[in-house]
């Protein structure tokens, strides 16, 4: 009995300490909102210095709810950074019909887009009819052909931004990986032959979401790592020296890191709960607490 009581007391103390730490980190997260906004704008300015040019944003996903489960940070930041004249296209390769809820999930995707992109921007949601499922192998040539009809990649007067998964697809989901394969084929086919590509300045930017395949700690550390990075920037005795140095563009040009502010995270979570009601099951709450993807997106950047 004494051992049981002692265990309960120790567990209560541990829970109390964890709760206090969570509160402190959340307060810091809110407090650092201006810093987060500044970092996001600097990152986007580095990749897209001429934001008032002719742009079109394209998000290629596999299932309805991918946009909010994995891509809410970049959706929110691109929506804030670019003027409202820049259209935003969400291209979903399936209806998410594995459980017979296809039409419901298409409606939910449209509701989600309306909540996440809540301004006067032109938003297009286009849903294809590939059958989703872990055992469903999609024809990449067919997807690429469909994407080429929806993304005007050959128009050199229009800067195309294409956002999708990387080759691992966050969770190694075969449908997510197909998004990457199709987008990569689309831009690679466009880029050939090289002589043709060199005739025109780059106008296509492909952003592939980093999956952290071999780093499960980073993948599920919520927003903690980013808060620690901000704190380090503030307290490091060498920060003024480092900031005085010219940026290492060779190292940074191929990477884009964006973070939701606390308010944007709350909006994304509310979007999941209200728009994607059919997908709200108990384990999703754990995702919204621990997953890095609902707080931070990091991308490998390629220009063509």
Curated annotation (Swiss-Prot):
TM region positions: 21-38
SUPFAM superfamilies, per this entry?
A: LmbE-like
Domain of life, source organism:
Eukaryota
Would the keyword Transferase be found if you checked this record's keyword annotation?
no
Extract one GO molecular function annotation from the record.
N-acetylglucosaminylphosphatidylinositol deacetylase activity
Q: Where in the cell is it found?
A: Endoplasmic reticulum membrane
Biological process, per Gene Ontology? GPI anchor biosynthetic process
Which keywords does the record carry? Endoplasmic reticulum, GPI-anchor biosynthesis, Hydrolase, Membrane, Transmembrane, Transmembrane helix
What does the protein in this record do? Involved in the second step of GPI biosynthesis. De-N-acetylation of N-acetylglucosaminyl-phosphatidylinositol.
Q: What is the protein name given in its UniProt record?
A: N-acetylglucosaminyl-phosphatidylinositol de-N-acetylase
Q: Which organism is it from?
A: Saccharomyces cerevisiae (strain ATCC 204508 / S288c) (Baker's yeast)
Please name the taxonomic classification of the source. Eukaryota, Fungi, Dikarya, Ascomycota, Saccharomycotina
Name of the gene encoding the protein in the UniProt record: GPI12
